[in-house]
Amino acid sequence: MAKVNLYISNDAYEKINAIIEKRRQEGAREKDVSFSATASMLLELGLRVYEAQMERKESAFNQAEFNKLLLECVVKTQSSVAKILGIESLSPHVSGNPKFEYANMVEDIREKVSVEMERFFPKNDDE
């Protein structure tokens, strides 16, 4: 194992010490959470992240093209489902049942989507 001396900022030093202290409070043994071992682990993790970013830059993945394709598929799906709902609401098997009237189905879908979206994107008081 190579030995390296390096200088780090006080902020980084304090954060590493906080990690060590937290792990000790969680019951880790003194020798398992030394400053050297923790700093080495963080350095290796940082190197993996750096290498992954470099690989991503070299890949042919185009985020804008992916977003465009994804949006196109979502719009096609939305349009198709709207037509299917319209057809289904005219079925004699469900006629007279307000639950299957087109306007009610659309409103029900919007409410359910709103609840799910709120889970992932909570509304701020500013909005």
From Swiss-Prot:
Could you give one GO CC term from the UniProt record? cytoplasm
Q: Which domain of life does the protein's organism represent?
A: Bacteria
Question: Which keywords does the record carry?
Answer: Conjugation, Cytoplasm, DNA-binding, Plasmid, Transcription, Transcription regulation
A Pfam family of this chain: Tra_M
Q: Where in the cell is it found?
A: Cytoplasm
Q: Does the keyword Transcription apply?
A: yes
- The answer to whether UniProt assigns keyword Transcription regulation to this entry is yes
Q: Which GO terms describe its molecular function?
A: DNA binding
Complex and partners: Homotetramer. 2 homotetramers cooperatively bind to DNA although they do not contact each other; cooperativity is achieved by DNA kinking and unwinding. Part of the relaxosome, a complex composed of plasmid encoded TraI, TraM, TraY and host-encoded IHF which binds to the F plasmid origin of transfer (oriT) in a site- and sequence-specific manner. Interacts with TraD. Also interacts with TraY.
Q: What does this protein do?
A: Conjugative DNA transfer (CDT) is the unidirectional transfer of ssDNA plasmid from a donor to a recipient cell. It is the central mechanism by which antibiotic resistance and virulence factors are propagated in bacterial populations. Part of the relaxosome, which facilitates a site- and strand-specific cut in the origin of transfer by TraI, at the nic site. Probably autoregulates its own expression. Plasmid specificity is conferred by the TraD-TraM pair.
Q: Which family, according to UniProt? A: Belongs to the relaxosome TraM family.
Query: What is this protein called in UniProt?
Result: Relaxosome protein TraM
| Gene giving rise to this polypeptide | traM
